[in-house]
């Protein structure tokens, strides 16, 4: 999947690039800007409003602190919804009918596989855009997020996903505040997300990865 590290243009406001790192996989940014301008505009507005204080950085907790909830306050009133999906797989086996390559119109066996898709949830979905924030969870959370977005994409529910997390340069602030023990290398940040995207764990789903800069 093609990846690009984005640079500011007239389409993508300069003030966002001053505050965030952007990496686009599968032309995710172009899809958002051209096909979903309303949804992207709401995300853009949420990113512009987003701020963090040193007091919030010091507060105990991971992804349930006040920091991630700032996106809740902006997006949920705009009809972004948390959604979970499940799905059953119904497999039909058709016997050969006559010559090779022709098959009966009726299956001779049917195999139902319950909960083939089981409980994938995404924090924010609107129209065909998915959005998730991973501030300070275990880095394996990215595997869950990417599998969920890939599954929603394969099922025809979404066309593009967005994941926001910490950029590497925030480590300078964490070190100055003596917080590196809390925001360690095994938590969610761009250094853990990008290799997963480079190895295509998102499947065919276009993903815009956004890193919060200092």
Residue ranges, per PLM feature:
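Active-site metal-binding core of divalent-cation-utilizing nuclease and nuclease-like domains
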Residues: 57-60, 69-127, 140-147
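Domain-level recognition of nuclease-like catalytic cores that cleave nucleotide substrates
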Residues: 167-214
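Soluble or luminal CAZymes and related metallo-dependent hydrolases
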Residues: 63-67, 141, 185-192
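Class I S-adenosyl-L-methionine-dependent methyltransferase catalytic core
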Residues: 58, 62, 116, 157-162, ...
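Catalytic core segments in nucleotide and nucleic-acid processing enzymes
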Residues: 135, 139, 144-161, 178, ...
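Nuclease-adjacent, charged terminal/linker segments that flank catalytic cores
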Residues: 1-88
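Glycine-rich active-site/cofactor-binding loop and its immediate structural neighborhood
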Residues: 130-133
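Hydrophobic, Leu/Ile/Phe/Ala-enriched alpha-helical segments that form helix-helix packing faces
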Residues: 67, 71-79, 152-153, 190-200
């Amino acid at each position: 999947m093609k990846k690009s590290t984005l640079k500011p243009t007239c389409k993508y406001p300069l003030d966002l690039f001053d505050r965030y790192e952007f990496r686009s996989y599968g032309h995710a940014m172009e899809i958002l800007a051209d096909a979903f301008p309303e949804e992207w505009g709401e995300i853009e507005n949420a990113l512009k409003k987003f701020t963090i204080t040193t007091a919030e950085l010091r507060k105990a907790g991971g992804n349930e602190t006040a920091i991630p909830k700032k996106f809740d306050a902006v997006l949920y009133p705009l009809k972004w919804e948390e959604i979970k999906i499940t799905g059953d797989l119904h497999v039909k086996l058709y016997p050969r009918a006559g010559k090779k390559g022709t098959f009966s119109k009726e299956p001779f066996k049917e195999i139902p596989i319950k909960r083939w898709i089981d409980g994938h949830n995404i924090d924010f979905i609107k129209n065909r855009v998915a959005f998730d924030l991973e501030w300070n969870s275990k880095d394996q959370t990215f595997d869950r997020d990417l599998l969920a977005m890939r599954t929603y994409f394969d099922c025809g529910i979404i066309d593009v996903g967005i994941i926001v997390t910490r950029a590497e340069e925030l480590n300078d602030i964490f070190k100055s505040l003596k917080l590196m023990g809390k925001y360690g290398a095994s938590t969610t940040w761009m250094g853990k997300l990008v290799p997963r995207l480079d190895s295509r764990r998102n499947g065919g789903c276009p993903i815009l990865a956004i890193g919060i800069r200092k």
